[in-house]
Amino acid sequence: MAEKISPGMQQYLDIKQDYPDAFLLFRMGDFYELFYEDAVNAAQILELTLTSRNKNSENPIPMAGVPHHAATEYIDKLVDLGYKVAVAEQMEDPKKAVGIVKRAVTQVITPGTTIDTANSVDNNFLVAIDFKAKRYALSYMDLSTGEFKVTELSEFSAVVGGIASLKAREIVVGFPLDEAQVKVFERQMNLLISEQFEIPENLLIELSGLTALENQAASKLLAYVKETQMRDLSHLQEVEHYEIKDFLQLDFATKSSLELTANKRENKKHGTLYWLLDETKTAMGTRMLRSWIDRPLVSNSAIQKRMEIVQVFLDHFFERSDLIEALKGVYDLERLASRVSFGKAVPVDFLQLANSLSNVPAIKNILEVLDETSLNELRSQLDEIPELSGLINSAISENASRTITEGGIIKKGYNVQLDKYREALENGTSWIAKLEADEKAKTGISTLRIDYNRKDGYYFHITQSQLNSVPEHFYRKATLKNSERFGSQELTEIEEIMLEAREKSSSLEYDLFMGLRAETEQYIGRLQALAKTIAEIDCLQSLSVVAEKQGYIRPTLTEGSRIVEIKGGRHAVVEAVMGAQEYVPNDIELPEQTDIQLITGPNMSGKSTYMRQFALTVIMAQIGSFVPAKTANLPIFDAIFTRIGASDNLISGESTFMVEMSEANHAIQKATSRSLIIFDELGRGTATYDGMALAQAIIEYVHEYIGAKTLFATHYHELTDLDKELDHLDNVHVATLEQNGNVTFLHKITDGPADKSYGIHVAKIAGLPQTLLERADLILQKLENKPLPAKKIADEQEQLSLFDFAENSSEIIEKIKGQNVDNMTAREALNFLWELKDSL
């Protein structure tokens, strides 16, 4: 016979049925309880004691619990690990409930919807994707700030890159994923996948500025958030369309290899461009700076607008110092507004709002003192919101606590009735003191005192030795070992007045605070707009501080130009780490007629640093920053593509060579004449002649068909002869100094090709045994005295070229164009290469 389930457990099971993919925290009195499999798993993850309900039954129910006052800590831990948590609250007072207490889920907290993040600076983006007619829509929002955006993309790879850049932890999918897509999101990107296929009619977004697919994706994201949060989200901004082409395009591989916002070793901020440029003083400014680095501008007018203000701040040290001090007093307005919207704002949050608003006049005044036209727009957007600051300052006590149940929140004078209750409490305290003094005098009991506890209320404390002096109007309340507790009619009357005043005072104060919180909601939009303006001011002062500290200059950017001229350029991050005194600056010159710079030189000599230096300088310039150089004249680039470093993609089963070819293909397919391409040692992942052939073919293809400014570092010295064949290619090399058998890398870029690779010298630096090095040197001398086993690649008649094939050259080119490389497997790609080789 099956065991009968109690009404309480049946209620739990009914609720759990609606949330099978979440841990269900079931409120029971002062605890949140977990049962069955949830209890077993949570006990292990959270290190809770696993016990059981109905221990003596045949099938005891596993159970674990957490105190309600500490629940947030445990919920955060589960969410940080990628789990969902459904919170079921008691919907009525258990003392007044008839039968079982009503319970219901009031919120589902997920990795993408949590607003109480441990790191209050970083965004916490929730993304959603939808698909129709071979097009994707990508929408994202940050519930903790209210940001809500959407765009449409043509390729799945662009979707993946966008999500990776946002560092999202959860994705809402609006269509069934195939197996490969699930693998990418779950295994490679470690995303929690949630589904939202339907859109409730009342949540359908139909904005004219969005495509139908964008409206659909944004609607599904909004529906998911409403379904999980179960509350009005007044802080969510209207969904905003954005275009990838409005920004400098940087794919995830490029951002990773250039270490823009996360270093490759630890995936942390230290040692990145973000780390270097971050002198922001507000949380909003820090988030905005990161978004600027993720999405540099392509509009010269927008870039110059930022640079003008950076220049103003740079030229006015004292005003900038005052501005920095004022910014330090501004709290995270975006997160505070979100907490108000979520109904989670506590008294301290309102004090932070008031303190933040009190600094706005100072910020505004500094911009007025500077009296620069470039600051007019920002100055006009600084809304002091005097109504809100006045409301908070009149209502909230400066000594208010973090909780809303402890009292002491509302200021004296804000509410007449509350003041009366407080007066009664204060009078009661003085009445108690007077009664104690009177009874001491009447009874002659010098040790008599009035105390209070929850059980007995107010009482007279009298020791055992004084019991014979107790007056007749006292009545016994409790007997202890060495003393007794007594009451009196007068003490009881005072107590009743005080308890009523305390209860009513507490209740009224709570209601007043909730009213204040509700009234503040009308200012959320203005707070968010103010936060955005302050964030922008903060970012611009940050760039000016870094420019001054590091000795940067304002670059000249010319729209439509193809001239690159950087004098005394430095790698911004490397210089900051090692110090300006030790860093060797380099010029970078790519005149109108030069598209490709072929860079040769030994390993460890600085080729990669030189190339990264160029890319970082471009990115810095296009976010509006000054740059590390003596002078810099740059075109405006539309995209940067990089292939730097060798690495296998073990998760997707791709070898180093396959990753190289995939990234090279991506650059070749997407680059335009306005792009910057950086290829470092392309072709090293395969056999020497295969690698050399492919490297040359790629150089020729970029030269003939794309015309992008390209830095191509190679260890194939034979490729340096290409400058005789390709009009828009120049050779440069990293200079070395040889003296008495010793080699010094000068880290200086010089015109012309390198004549040696110095591989054995690099091995010596690495500490290989001397005997081994001497043997290697001997072998090298023998090899250098032998003729090459095949004709030199640069021999004019035998040169491999995509454009000097025999009669079938156009046929081969058409074959390459006709291949959908994105969908080829590694095996198919290799077979295709062999097929091309056979047809040469």
From Swiss-Prot:
Transmembrane segments: none
Matching SUPFAM superfamilies: DNA repair protein MutS, domain I (SSF55271), DNA repair protein MutS, domain II (SSF53150), DNA repair protein MutS, domain III (SSF48334), P-loop containing nucleoside triphosphate hydrolases (SSF52540)
GO molecular function: ATP binding; ATP-dependent DNA damage sensor activity; damaged DNA binding; mismatched DNA binding
Keywords: ATP-binding, DNA damage, DNA repair, DNA-binding, Nucleotide-binding
GO CC annotations on file: cytosol
Gene Ontology process terms (BP): mismatch repair
InterPro entries per UniProt: DNA_mismatch_repair_MutS, DNA_mismatch_repair_MutS-lik_N, DNA_mismatch_repair_MutS/MSH, DNA_mismatch_repair_MutS_C, DNA_mismatch_repair_MutS_clamp, DNA_mismatch_repair_MutS_core, DNA_mismatch_repair_MutS_N, DNA_mismatch_repair_MutS_sf
Gene3D superfamilies linked: 1.10.1420.10, DNA repair protein MutS, domain I, MutS, connector domain, P-loop containing nucleotide triphosphate hydrolases
The keyword Cell cycle appears for this protein: no
Amino acids binding ATP: G601, P602, N603, M604, S605, G606, K607, S608
Family listed: Belongs to the DNA mismatch repair MutS family.
Record function comment: This protein is involved in the repair of mismatches in DNA. It is possible that it carries out the mismatch recognition step. This protein has a weak ATPase activity.
NCBIfam families the UniProt entry points to: mutS1 (TIGR01070), PRK05399.1 (NF003810)
Protein name stated in the entry: DNA mismatch repair protein MutS
